[in-house]
């Protein structure tokens, strides 16, 4: 079988490939305008760590200024990204005391993003267990918390 117009065949093939690439690229979402640029620091107790895709979740209880316990969610890297830097389900366990720093959602809900300019300190060992730069390349330089708590 002879191809009548190779330009049409090439253009069709290129269109299919570009369409597939655009579909893949659109699978992720932006968060422009969703989070405060100011860094929020919280100290609390781990309730659960969910190493899942597309974003892992750290759930922790934090005491507010009035002494009431507020349940916070912290969203960060996917399970594969965390595994590459040595994370397992044992890295943070229920009951661990942590200090986290990240960008809070603008709505004021108890939700924080740890994907960039973020850190997690495990207070028992005063260990810096997560910096967003470990995966994404930025390297926040926040001081370590007072681990004598």
How would you describe each model-predicted region?
Residues 44-46:
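Conserved hydrophobic positions within beta-strands
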Residues 75-84:
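Short, structured beta-strand/loop micro-motifs enriched in basic residues and often containing a Trp
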Residues 135-149:
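Glycine- and charge-enriched low-complexity intrinsically disordered segments
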Residues 25-40:
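Short boundary/loop segments of OB/S1/cold-shock single-stranded nucleic-acid-binding domains
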């Amino acid at each position: 079988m002879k191809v009548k117009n190779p330009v049409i065949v090439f253009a069709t093939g290129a269109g299919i490939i570009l369409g597939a690439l655009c579909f893949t690229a659109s699978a992720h979402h932006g968060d422009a305008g969703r989070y405060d640029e100011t860094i929020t620091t919280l100290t609390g107790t781990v309730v659960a760590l969910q190493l899942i895709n597309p974003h892992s979740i750290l759930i922790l209880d934090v005491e507010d200024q009035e002494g009431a316990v507020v349940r916070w969610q912290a969203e960060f890297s996917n399970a594969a990204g965390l595994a590459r830097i040595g994370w397992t389900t044992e890295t943070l366990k229920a009951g661990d005391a942590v200090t986290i720093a990240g960008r809070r959602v603008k709505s004021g809900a108890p939700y924080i993003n740890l994907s960039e300019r973020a850190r997690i300190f495990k207070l028992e060992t005063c260990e810096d267990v997560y910096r967003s730069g470990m995966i994404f390349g930025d390297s926040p330089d926040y001081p370590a918390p007072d681990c004598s708590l």
